[in-house]
Amino acid sequence: MWRLKVAEGDKNSPYMFTTNNFVGRQIWEFDPKAGSPEELAEVEEARQKFYKNRHNVKPAGDLLWRLQFLREKNFKQRIPQVKVKDGDAITYETATTAMKRAAHYFSAIQASDGHWPAENAGPMYFLPPFVFCLYITGHLNTVFTVEHRREILRYLYNHQHEDGGWGVHVEAPSSMFGTVFSYLCMRLLGLGPNDGENNACARARKWIRDHGGVTYIPSWGKNWLSILGIFEWSGTNPMPPEFWILPSFVPLHPSKMWCYCRLVYMPVSYLYGKRFVGPITPLIQQLREELHTQPYNEINWRKVRHLCSKEDLYYPHPFVQELLWDTLYLASEPLLTRWPLNKLIRQKALKETMKFIHYEDHNSRYITIGCVEKPLCMLACWVEDPNGIAFKKHLNRIADYIWLGEDGMKVQTFGSQTWDTALGLQALMACNIADEVESVLGKGHDYLKKAQIRDNPVGDYKGNFRHFSKGAWTFSDQDHGWQVSDCTAEGLKCVLQLSLMPPEIVGEKMEPERLYDAVNFLLSLQDEKTGGLAVWERAGASLLLEWLNPVEFLEDLIVEHTYVECTASAIEAFMLFKKLYPHHRKKEIENFIVKAVHYIEDEQTADGSWYGNWGICFIYGTCFALGGLQVAGKTYNNCLAIRRAVDFLLNAQSDDGGWGESYKSCPNKIYTPLEGKRSTVVHTALAVLSLISAGQADRDPTPIHRGVKLLINSQLENGDFPQQEIMGVFMRNCMLHYAEYRNIFPLRALAEYRKRVPLPN
């Protein structure tokens, strides 16, 4: 039986190290002796329920670890369930009951180190590169055991569409990228060309060939297929490693790039520069025949470089970008790959590129910045030295990415531990039931204190294009090491709120110097021109560089941008901080808030909403924006932006009293309700929180009551809420499953409703 283990790692291994005793780490291990018949039956029931409903609800309920934790804690929901009948008013007692049921359930699924585990996955291209890398390096069978393979295949079967393909994420229609990667994953894991549940392989192969064959895969796919030997590097657009030795005044210098873009193309350029190709095994030769629609040796590789299937094409390459690729392909690459330039320049560039890779690996404890980068960096280390220490350290951190749900085994971004914990603790504190959850608050507080980044990246971090990180919080755990602005803002807000509570309940408050470090980090990321806050590093590079975005299915990934959600979270954190610590950088904080408020007002869309960059979509963005405006002193009466936002929310309310938004809002950039105007508990909770922030209860609380009625009536018997549509997004067009949102936001909405909306006894 599979079990989730928390805050564990081999401290004696020379190939694994940690900055804080592995606090926040979450890994899955299989124990063949574990599990009673009842436990095993419970897990199997969850799997079967997902399978039967897989075409209706695509994201998993993330139930396996929840079942484990609830069993380990002997949790039983002892508060009777409540429902609100049509025509009945919601009483204070009813709201309190529903809130406490949600709070007790949420408290029971806290991990031993104080964080809340959760799936943070959804894209179908996260997992396969791990399989590709391990296949090439010869470690596939040792890292992915028979039990791993069974669960990986379960995941692929569960998310295969009826047309035989897979999307770029679990809710997206079939695409070449998702289908080819999933097909290769099945074949490399040992399935034959006609094997798999419900003819999975044959159906997938038919989809690929019916849509033109593998030459139509997007550029990221072309890179991996070239590495595997199913494509030729001459069929890809150049990614020269000389990029990393350019002088800093060059417009597209790496220091001007968004960190994730930088760290994807760093190892890609190394592998491209070496023209590395894995072993051409009989299976690889067979895959060449299966995936191409013409004989492999007859393909004109030069002509396929710019091909991309219409199913994958979200961001077409502008003419100026294709001109750049063609110039590099026809002019510079022939020179750089021949003597003497291959010795004078290319070899130097390859060495410098690997130095950057090693620097990033070391500063993330070989977790790397994310799951797309991890297998690329790991493979680059193996290519440099198959028996080297760097590659061995990479192998030990693969487990940090593996996640298991009732839908099978997947790879996640790297984890949302700190983000979920900060939001979850704030929801619990809003309940005003500290006496019932004091140990939960204390453990969560302890986790946040241990998760804060204590130092900057080692060595010359500026020379490695890094921003300072001391005082920040990451999205996941401290070992990951990458600072994030909204995680820092929510973490800071959380520890400040906890500092107002008795230390005998929640533990000693954080030292002021560490709070100052967090403030310094947040102040450093405000854009001087717009007043908006970036996420990882300073924004400010020319947005014209986005014309060079090579990724056909994502947008806005070349340079760092500013974001409404991050800006709003920082306003909330600073408003509380300056109240408690009025003398630290007072003038700078006040100026920050003024500029940030103007930025949020300027970013409002024509319909009164705000675009959500990290959640779906306009309802999510509007909730954060209104929270920031409200704490800064803006009200319905003195702020036109708030009045317009309220109109948007009231117009978007569904007939059932709730709210529900389609993920299609994100790529289309237009508010799109769910089909049939269905509601979700997360969107409903976000809208309720927004209306409460905007003072709707003082004017007409009816829309709020209707939304809360839906939340209360949706609550499950054990205090959980149902899993519905996917709720996260990144780079406009790729969705991400935040499994904990269905607990955090309804709990917070019920707590704020009970506290701020007058209710009858």
Swiss-Prot record:
Alphabetical list of CDD domains matching this protein: SQCY_1
Keyword Repeat: yes
Pfam families attached to this UniProt entry: SQHop_cyclase_C (PF13243), SQHop_cyclase_N (PF13249)
Gene Ontology CC entries for this record: lipid droplet
Pathway: Secondary metabolite biosynthesis; terpenoid biosynthesis
PFTB repeats: 99-141, 149-190, 441-485, 515-561, 593-633, 642-683, 704-745
Coiled-coil positions: none
EC annotation from Swiss-Prot or TrEMBL: 5.4.99.56
Gene3D superfamilies associated with the record: 1.50.10.20
Active-site residue list: D486
Keyword terms, alphabetized: Isomerase, Repeat
Major enzyme class: isomerase
Catalysed conversion reaction: (S)-2,3-epoxysqualene = tirucalla-7,24-dien-3beta-ol
Protein's UniProt keywords contain tRNA-binding: no
Molecular-function GO terms, alphabetical: beta-amyrin synthase activity
Gene Ontology biological process: triterpenoid biosynthetic process
InterPro entries (UniProt xref): SQ_cyclase_C, SQ_cyclase_N, Squalene_cyclase, Terpene_synthase_CS, Terpenoid_cyclase/PrenylTrfase
Job description of the protein: Oxidosqualene cyclase involved in the biosynthesis of limonoids triterpene natural products such as limonin, a compound with insecticidal activity responsible for the bitter taste in citrus. Converts 2,3-oxidosqualene (2,3-epoxysqualene) into tirucalladienol, generating rings and asymmetric centers in a single transformation.
The family this protein is said to belong to: Belongs to the terpene cyclase/mutase family.
Name of this protein: Tirucalladienol synthase OSC1
